[in-house]
From Swiss-Prot:
Residues 1-21 form the signal peptide. Monomer. Disulfide bonds join C214-C231. Zn(2+) 2 binds at H99, H102, D104, H408. It comes from the Bacteria. Its main location: periplasm. Changing H167A: Loss of zinc binding to site 1 and no effect on zinc transfer to AztC. Disruption phenotype: No effect on growth and no effect on zinc cellular level in zinc repleted media. In zinc limited media, growth is reduced in a znuA mutant background and also in an aztC mutant background. In zinc depleted media, zinc cellular levels are reduced and levels are further reduced in a znuA mutant background, an aztC mutant background or a znuA and aztC mutant background. It comes from Paracoccus denitrificans (strain Pd 1222). GO terms for molecular function: zinc chaperone activity; zinc ion binding. One of its GO terms (cellular component) is periplasmic space. It is found in: Periplasm. The gene is aztD. Zn(2+) 1 binds at H124, H167, H218. This is Zinc chaperone AztD.
Amino acid sequence: MLRHLAGASALALTLAGAGFAQDHDHDHEDVTLYRVFVGDHEKGQVTAFDLAEPDHRWTFPTTGQVKLYSVAGGAVVAAVQSDADTVQFIRSGISFHDHGDHRDIEVGDPAAIDASLTGPRPFHLVEHDGKVVLNYDQGGYAEILDGHALAEGKAEPGRFPQARAHHGFVAPLGGNWLSTVASDEKVEGDASVPRLGLQAFDAEGNPAGNLATCTGIHGEAFSGAYLAAGCKEGVLTVKAGANGSEYKLLPYPADLPQGVTTGTLLGSTGIQVFLGNYGPDGLVVIDPVDEPHYRYIKLPFRRVDFALDPAKPSTGYVLTEDGSLHRIDLLKAEIVASAKVTEPYSMDGHWNDPRPRIAMAGDEIVVTDPNAGLVRRIATEDLSERGTVPVEGKPYNIAVTGGSGVTH
């Protein structure tokens, strides 16, 4: 049974609606605003625009190609540039202040934050419990930022040491830090360092528990009380317990396709459930508590990108290589609607070839279309196209900030 999380209804009300709306009252204005940030595939550049008024746009130079993350409650967009050994930050120009029965919204122009991070191949970014954590795959450490300070333009990281550099992640949970752990096995050339599993540490990097086996650990997400990570054997779940981190491995069941694993996970904010990839043409809905832990969704074509809808926690979307966007019902674990939204983009070729990416913006899904030089606006209601926004170059990775609030 999927567990609903407190605050889901409020979240849905907060995020519902798209574009920009105002409702005048004697004392306040209700404002809904979404701002879209798009990274170019070929040149170091991020383009930002307001969804309902795309002529309100800004351009930010970057060192290299970016992966974009909305962090610090949407006040900041992190631009992770793995190949350029750099992480830059952009203040989104949108911030929220919670007042219990409502939240205030402040809107201004986006602006680059002067401070940036540099280090050997930053890759996975994890945000949880007010912390933003970046793993340096070739550095043997992670850097930890305070989300509130980052929203104020301060990037002053602390460092979490790892025993060996590897492609992994670090995340806070309870009073400890969870870190992937690599083997000390010698590797040749560009071969990846084997990853053994997940372990709890204190802030100085001292072990605070035993290693939980999760061979080839990759991908992480939070939902409710749990963190989940993909493994060769199954999906490892972790929650904070009275005596430290509590681990449970959910083995892949025999009735799932064999020879493939989960390596990318998304966590719902309104119900305690995860959506993960399962091979190139499948998804799994994962319940960390109740059986069946896995429910498999076969896709008609290979997956290009997928996302969860924060306003409708039981809903997800997946784009497949034929150019179709599919709505996923997580409660039923099935595709409930589909529509063609782009030309086909084959998954053959390099993993980083220019292909569409999707993100949620209230009652719209925004889809980058690199070959067309567009961001497409797709209605969640019926998957119809509401409009397109031209973006110079090859629009690729995407992040959205914003929502609804009150101005006084």
